[in-house]
Structures are given as structure tokens and as C-alpha cells.
């Protein structure tokens, strides 16, 4: 997994376990966590690592290829665990060539700032996944 970010962000963590990788960048207003989870990646271990990274007081965006379809399994362990922590899953259209939503984006509004967002889908001829483009801005 590669993470690209602007100068106002700083790299906070990289975690690589058997079956998943996590990268976190942060700035004063926002934490962003990127994930790749293979089909065999342990979801309990993934959530445990995320709980250690998430600051519940801070607005946080989590996104990545979870390899779990929220259309087929809307109450899967990852989605239900993140919902319990105050996250909302915002991807609503298929992101995979087979028609599933296996690429997720979760947002939790913290005490510090509130975000508004726009999500765009970018079909790619060279991949079985659509690209997702998330634009965010602060709401006053």
C-alpha cells in the first residue's frame, strides 16, 4: 500500500500484519487511515489495531479495500464494529467488477471539526475495482 499526502499531514503509523496493512496520516483537524485487507485477513485483529489508532475525539476517515461486500454482508464484523464506534460507511455503489461493494470509506465526526464530503467513482479499465475520490471540506 502507498500513501500520498500533503505537507500539512504527518505520517503517524504503518502496520503490516498477516492478511492486512494499515497506514495512518494525521493533521490537527483530521486523521486518515488507509487499509488493505486480503480475503484471509483476520477481521478481529484488524479492528483491534484500528481501535488502537482511532482517537474518538478527532474526525477520522478510514478507507480501503476490505474484501468484504457490504451488499451481501451489511452486518459484517468490520462494518458493525466501526458503526459501534460512531463511523458511517458512505460507499453506496458497486466498486468491484462483480457488482460488490468491497472498497469502503467510513467517516466519524469528532469533537474538533465537522466535515462535509463528496464521493466520486472512477471506473478503471486496468483494474477490477473502481477508484474512489473523496473530497472533504470543513463545515463551520
At which residue positions do the language-model features occur?
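A basic- and aromatic-enriched beta-loop-alpha substructure that forms the phosphate/nucleotide-
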Residues: 1-3
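Active-site regions of metal-assisted phosphoester/phosphodiester hydrolases
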Residues: 5-86, 90-97, 111-140
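Nucleotide-cofactor and metal-assisted catalytic machinery
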Residues: 106
